[in-house]
Amino acid sequence: MIVGILQLDIIIHDSNSLKAKRGNIRKILSRVKNTFEVAAAEVGYQDLWQRAEIGVAAVGNDRAVVNQRLDHVLNFV
């Protein structure tokens, strides 16, 4: 079993409050989870309104497939 992780540090320019940031992050996480069948969550900077840290994890039998899936997530975000 191969487990791959991806850590994204995102700057959100159009966010002007924590509520707006959380709405944007919720949309991103939902689309990433549904499109790529990975686990994703906001893992850092929860109190900053223009910055977010997202963690993504994928599991598979083949390293190339896991790496490719995480590369697609990175390009998508």
Segments (PLM) and residue ranges:
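Short, charge-patterned binding micro-sites
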Residues: 3, 41-62
